[in-house]
């Protein structure tokens, strides 16, 4: 057991015991934590079954059983979406809203019981430490899924990426310049990967073929709030694995000189400068990396 895992496991044991995770009735709600968490996640605004499944990462059958329990107690109502009857909407009943407010109040009381004994300085330290821990854990555990470039989450992520380039490039950015990339990253030809949190995209990236044996990393983007937590490096490694799976022995990429944090990440990941290999009008630096592992072999040829 490493020191890192030992500290994390000790914290898990301490915290779960302190907040009553093992109690049959979490915070005196009459429900265990799983049911209470679902009730809280539905909230006054309601949610779709699909959103709840994705937010809580629950198996469909298990989520159905939890919703049935809340429904049997008169706390939630599940009905088809009038705008799309393939979707199901979940909303709180009047009794459910009362239960939700009680759960929210007791959760706040529990949190206060932890922070109130601390001095103001130590509260600030705890808040900063928890914010950092929350971001790092989410970045390390978020699911990276391969989708078609036309997937709604992927389209939204690329839209954020293009908007950021337009803001940061001195000359702006014309999204039409990369319109053909989506087709070349479709399954079979390439790969496109997206990461979502609470139903919203927080990172994306793709791989397309430059020529046989050489893949290109494209559209690498991480939401600003998630930067500095290692998600970009994790996405890059994932894309390299996708490139190897597609049979590429080497990957290349281009970038703009204004994206200094991206250039730093590429250099730390083992990328080396190479000559220009495309006609991208926004590219000012080009990099390459020889892949190692299954599906690849060492190659010294250049782009």
Q: Can you annotate each of these PLM segments?
A:
Residues 1-34, 153-158:
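N-terminal leader segment of winged-helix/HTH proteins
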Residues 105-145, 149, 287-289:
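Terminal interaction helix/tail motif
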Residues 146-150, 249-269, 275-303:
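C-terminal "cap" of GNAT-fold acetyltransferases
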Residues 222, 228-241, 264-268:
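Conserved acetyl-CoA-binding loop-helix of GNAT-fold acetyltransferases
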Residues 21-62, 67, 73-75, 182-195, ...:
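N-terminal helix-turn-helix DNA-binding core of bacterial DNA-binding proteins
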Residues 21, 139, 146-218, 223, ...:
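Acetyl-CoA-dependent GNAT
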Residues 50-51, 214, 236, 242-256:
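Conserved GNAT acetyl-CoA-binding A-motif
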Residues 46-88, 97, 199-200, 204-206, ...:
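Canonical helix-turn-helix DNA-binding module
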């Amino acid at each position: 057991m490493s020191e890192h895992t030992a500290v994390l496991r000790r914290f898990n044991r301490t915290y779960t015991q302190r907040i009553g995770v093992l109690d049959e009735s979490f915070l005196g709600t009459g429900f265990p934590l799983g049911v209470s968490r679902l009730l809280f996640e539905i909230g006054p605004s309601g949610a779709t079954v699909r959103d709840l499944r994705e937010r809580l990462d629950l198996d469909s059958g298990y989520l159905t059983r939890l919703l049935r329990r809340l429904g049997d107690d008169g706390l939630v109502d599940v009905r088809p979406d009038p705008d799309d009857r393939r979707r199901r909407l979940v909303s709180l009943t009047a009794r459910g809203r009362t239960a939700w407010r009680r759960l929210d109040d007791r959760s706040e009381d529990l949190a206060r019981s932890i922070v109130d004994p601390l001095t103001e300085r130590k509260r600030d330290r705890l808040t900063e430490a928890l914010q950092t821990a929350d971001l790092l854990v989410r970045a390390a555990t978020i699911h990276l899924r391969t989708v078609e470039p036309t997937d709604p989450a992927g389209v939204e992520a690329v839209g954020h990426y293009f908007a950021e380039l337009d803001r940061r490039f001195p000359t702006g950015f014309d999204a039409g310049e990369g319109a053909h990339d989506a087709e070349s990253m479709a399954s079979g030809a390439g790969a496109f990967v997206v990461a979502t949190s609470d139903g919203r995209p927080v990172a994306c990236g793709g791989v397309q073929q430059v020529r046989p044996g050489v893949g290109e990393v494209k559209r690498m983007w991480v939401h600003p709030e998630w930067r500095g937590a290692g998600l970009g490096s994790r996405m890059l490694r994932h894309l390299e694995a996708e490139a190897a799976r597609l049979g590429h022995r080497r990957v290349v990429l281009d970038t703009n000189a204004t994206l200094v944090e991206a250039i730093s990440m590429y250099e730390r990941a083992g990328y080396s400068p190479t000559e220009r290999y495309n006609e991208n009008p926004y590219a000012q630096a080009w990099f390459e990396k020889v892949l190692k592992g299954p599906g690849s072999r060492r190659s010294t040829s250049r782009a």
